Amino acid sequence: MKLSLSPGSFNELEFYRFILDNDLFRFGETVLASGRKSCFKLDWEPALTKLRTLDYVARSVLAKVNDLGLEPDLFIGVPEGVTSLGVAIQLLWAEKTGLDNLVISRKNEGYVGNPAHQQIVYIEDTVTTGGSIVRELEKAVKHQAWPTAVISLADRKQLTDSGKTVREVVESQGMAYHNLSSVPSLLVGAYAKGLIPEDLAKKIEAEYAHLQEGWLLGKEKPLWSGIVD
C-alpha cells in the first residue's frame, strides 16, 4: 500500500486499509492491558517501530487534529506503547507551529520535561476501558498541566464494568474524545478479507453482546459500515 504522507484532511478509509494491510490484528486468547480477556487484540508495535509507518500514523493524527481545529501545546503518548508516536507527532507539530517543547510521560509517576500550564492532547493506541487515560489525567492535574483532549488510534467500542463507553469516561473527566477507527468496523473488514474463521467470528460476536446480532457474520454489511459510530 502506498502511504499518503502529505498534510490535509484525515483519510478514514485509507487508515482502515493501513491497519488491515499491515496485519496488526492478533487472533487468539490474550489478556489486554486493561486486564480483560479477549480472543483478539490490535498490536500497534510493528507500525510504530518502523519510521515510515510511524510517520504515516503521526501525520494521520495531525490530519485529524487539523480537521478538529485543535491547537494544543503538547502531544503526549500514553506510556509506554505510544511514547514514540507522541514524540513523532510533537516534532511534526513543531515544524508547523514553531513550538519548541517536548514532554514525555513516564510509565508511573512524573515526566521527562515539564508539562505545567500547557494544553495537552493525549494519544492512545487501542482503548478498551479508558483506565490508562484517567490515570494520565490525574497525573497531569498534579503537575498543573491542562489536558484538553484524547485521540485514540482505535476504539474497541466495548463497555466498562459500569456500562459506560470510553467516550463517556473521558468526557466525564472534562476532556474531548476522538478516535481514528472503530474496531468492530475493522473486524468486519478483516472478516471480509478472510482473516477471521467463522468459529472465531462467533467468539468475537459474543464479546460484543451489546451490538446487534450478526453484526460481524451478517452477509449484507458493507466493509466500512460504521456499525457503532
Report the location of each language-model feature:
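PRPP-associated nucleotide enzymes
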Residues: 1-229
